[in-house]
Amino acid sequence: TYVSTEALKDGGSWQQVARKENCRGWAVHTQNNIFGYTDWLINRPANAWYCTHLWQHYAYTLDKEYLRDTAWPVMKVTCQYWFDRLKENTEGRLVAPNEWSPEHGPWEDGVAYAQQLVYALFEETLAAAGVLAVDDAFVSELKEKFSRLDNGLHIGSWGQIKEWTIQEDKQGDHQRHLSHLMALYPCDQISYLKDKRYAEAAKVALDSRGDGATGWSRAWKVACWARLWDGERAY
């Protein structure tokens, strides 16, 4: 895939973004293409988001050769990027510093968008290590950092999944982005099958966004309502 090609290209533009921050691995901005182009505003957690697609390809195909040769090398160096970037907060949890909820609100440490995506990256990379029977120094470090990683799931004052750590979410804010619900969709940390509290909090947050939006945002909301087992609202 072009993601593996560009992420692993020595001295490529995606690696250069990471090197500017003194990090291993790679990172991208908001706009990217198959030729390695990346521009506009920084979107660091997008590298973790890309990796979810690599893992999902394996999960649906069970192609172990693909996992070993294509997905694993990218997932590994992406984790190393976050090893270098994460910081410890006052509670001893690892958080992504100076991140944002795309097109919405302030820049803060530990924003839900970043935390949920990095959590998915670490969790799925550990799953990949299990499939491939990899147990080395990298996996040991990954396990240690994953155990201290903030998962980005915090319930706010009006029962919602919080979008930021410090900034207070505004009820009835109809922002089209649902970046604080990455753990609901496309990731799967939030589910009625896993923890009803978080599923209910995601429902409160999603309902607060309203149903009106641009086309892509409506499609996203359909997927989120489906994940919450509400076929009528999705329809």
Where are each of the predicted segments found?
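Carboxylate/His-rich catalytic cores and anion/metal-binding grooves
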Residues: T1-C23
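Secretory-pathway/luminal and periplasmic proteins that interact with or process carbohydrate-rich
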Residues: T5-G12, Y81-T90, G105-P106, G152-S157, ...
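Active-site core of glycosidic bond-cleaving carbohydrate-active enzymes
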Residues: T1-L8, N32-F35, D39-K64, D69, ...
